[in-house]
Design a protein with these regions (language model features):
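Compact, glycine/acidic-enriched structural inserts
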Residues: 104-145
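Mixed-charge (acidic/basic) macromolecular-recognition segments
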Residues: 130-184
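A surface-exposed partner-binding patch
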Residues: 1-104, 164-211
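Intrinsic-disorder-associated interaction segments
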Residues: 2, 121, 125, 145-152, ...
Length: 211
C-alpha cells in the first residue's frame, strides 16, 4: 500500500507511463548507501517513468560516472558521496547524498548545480527516510519542465512532435542552451541520455546556485 507522500506524488504526476521492476540484487547493493524509504519505493513502485518521461526514478549505477564528472572540482565532490535517484526529461539529475540526503539537482541543460542549503546537513536514518518522503511529496510537474522563449511549457509539445521518451532518452537542445541556443521546439532533439549529459559536462565548470 502506498504511503501518503508517494500518493501525493502520484496525484501530481499520474501513474507510471513506463515501469521497470527493480531486481532484489540492486536493493541489497544499495542498502548501506541510500535511505530505506527510497529502497521501499523501488520495491513497491519500480524504476518508473512518469508523464511520458518527464520524470523518472533511476538506477544510480547508470549515472555514477556522469555524477562524478559534474561534481568534479566542486565543493560537493568531497563533502558527501552523491548518487542519482531521479532524472527529468531534459536531463536534470536529482541527487541523494549518503550523509546529507536530497540537496543537489544538476541542471545539465543550463550547466548549473542547484544547492538546497537548508537541507544540507547530516541526517539520521529516520531523517533520511523523511527526506525521501518529502522529496517525492513536494515534486511538481512544472519543476521538471522548461518554459520556451514565449513562456510556454515545452515538454508536452516535444512529446507531441517527437514521441514519448524511451528509458535511456532525454530531450536536448541544439545548440545547447548555455551555449546560446534558443529554448524552442525546433531546437529539441531526442538524445541518448548518457552521451548527451557526458558531452554537456565537458564544456565548462558548472555554475552553483542556491535553490
Amino acid at each position: 500500500m502506498r504511503d501518503d507522500d508517494f500518493g501525493h506524488f502520484i496525484e501530481e504526476f499520474g501513474e507510471a507511463t513506463r515501469h521497470v521492476v527493480v531486481p532484489n540484487t540492486a536493493i541489497e547493493k544499495w542498502k548501506s548507501h541510500l535511505p530505506n524509504r527510497l529502497l521501499h519505493y523501488w520495491k513497491t513502485e519500480g524504476w518508473n517513468s512518469y508523464q511520458n518521461g518527464l520524470f523518472s526514478i533511476v538506477n544510480p549505477d547508470d549515472y555514477e560516472s556522469i555524477v562524478d564528472m559534474w561534481l568534479e572540482d566542486t565543493p560537493f565532490e568531497s563533502a558527501d558521496t552523491y548518487h542519482a535517484i531521479g532524472r527529468s526529461g531534459f536531463g536534470d539529475l536529482c541527487l541523494c547524498g549518503e550523509k546529507t540526503g536530497t540537496n543537489l539537482i544538476i541542471s545539465c541543460a543550463f550547466n548549473t548545480i542547484y544547492y538546497n542549503k537548508g537541507n544540507y546537513y547530516e541526517k539520521s536514518k529516520e531523517q533520511a527516510d523523511l527526506d525521501i518522503s518529502t522529496f517525492f511529496a513536494s515534486r511538481h510537474i512544472d519543476s521538471f519542465d522548461i518554459e520556451d522563449d514565449d513562456d510556454v511549457w515545452i515538454f508536452s509539445k516535444a512529446v507531441e512532435k517527437y514521441g514519448s521518451l524511451n528509458e535511456n532518452e532525454v530531450f536536448g537542445f541544439e545548440p545547447a542552451i548555455f551555449l546560446g541556443g534558443d529554448v524552442e521546439l525546433d531546437s529539441i532533439r531526442k538524445m541518448d541520455v548518457y552521451i548527451h549529459l557526458d558531452i554537456l559536462g565537458q564544456f565548462s565548470k558548472p555554475l552553483i546556485q542556491e535553490a
